[in-house]
A protein has these predicted regions:
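Sec-dependent bacterial lipoprotein signal peptides
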Residues: 1-16
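Generic detector of short alpha-helix boundary/capping microenvironments
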Residues: 2, 42-43, 147
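N-terminal targeting sequences that direct proteins away from the cytosol to non-cytosolic compartments
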Residues: 14-81, 92-105, 109-110, 115-122, ...
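A short gly/proline-enriched turn/hairpin at secondary-structure junctions
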Residues: 87-89
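Short, Gly/Ser/Thr-enriched beta-strand-loop segments that form substrate-interacting elements
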Residues: 131-145
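A short, hydrophobic, proline-anchored segment that marks a local hinge/packing element in signaling
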Residues: 146-152
């Protein structure tokens, strides 16, 4: 005869399986191989190295108006759903220079609502007359990386990295790290003509 304790153990062990939800997963990202090529736009006073896997798109509208310069363009990386929006301005005087710098800071600070931290990284390359600031924006901001570069007398270039997706810092972190290297390469290789 089977002991009653053993039978009660068997009945207790046969309870229904309680499913546990699987952790949320994100699609696998295939990163392109890091290759850079020279970029020089006719009529623009600068050159730099752009990713070889990017598509350079001339910007055609600015808030439903014509763009202010032929040197406004986007560096699009379709495989990562990312764009670096670049705007070039000629400096016509000290007041204009101050206005452009203030605008760059204002544009970066607009992300303070969602940002948890904004790091300002100074850029000084005196040999190439390139100076500026890179804004590394942490948190769920729409643009996580922005910059401006200038020679402080004639040329001013502003750029901002955007992803065509909802800002999710944790899931975007690897792609953001990949794209930051491309922005840094642009900043490191920019030369005024």
């Amino acid at each position: 005869m089977i002991p009653i304790g053993f039978l009660s153990f068997l009945f207790a062990a046969c309870e229904d399986y309680v499913p546990v939800p699987k952790p949320r997963a994100f699609p696998r990202v295939i990163y392109p191989e890091k290759v850079y090529q020279p970029f020089k736009q006719t009529g623009c006073n600068f050159s730099f190295e752009a990713p070889g896997y990017a598509v350079i798109e001339r910007d055609s509208t600015f808030f439903e108006e014509q763009v202010r310069s032929d040197c406004w363009f986007n560096i699009a990386v379709p495989s990562l759903n990312a764009k670096i929006h670049c705007s070039y301005y000629p400096i016509t005087g000290r007041a204009r220079f101050d206005e452009l710098v203030q605008d760059a800071f204002t544009m970066a600070q607009k992300h303070n609502i969602k940002a948890s931290f904004i790091e300002e990284i100074p850029i000084h390359r005196p040999a190439d007359h390139v100076h500026g600031i890179v804004f590394a924006i942490e948190g769920a901001a729409a643009s996580s990386y922005q910059f401006f570069l200038t020679d402080s007398t004639e040329n001013f270039l502003r750029g901002a990295l955007y992803f065509n997706t909802q800002a999710r810092p944790d899931s975007l972190a690897p792609v953001l790290a990949f794209m930051r290297k491309d922005v840094n390469r642009l900043v490191e290789t920019l030369k005024w003509e």
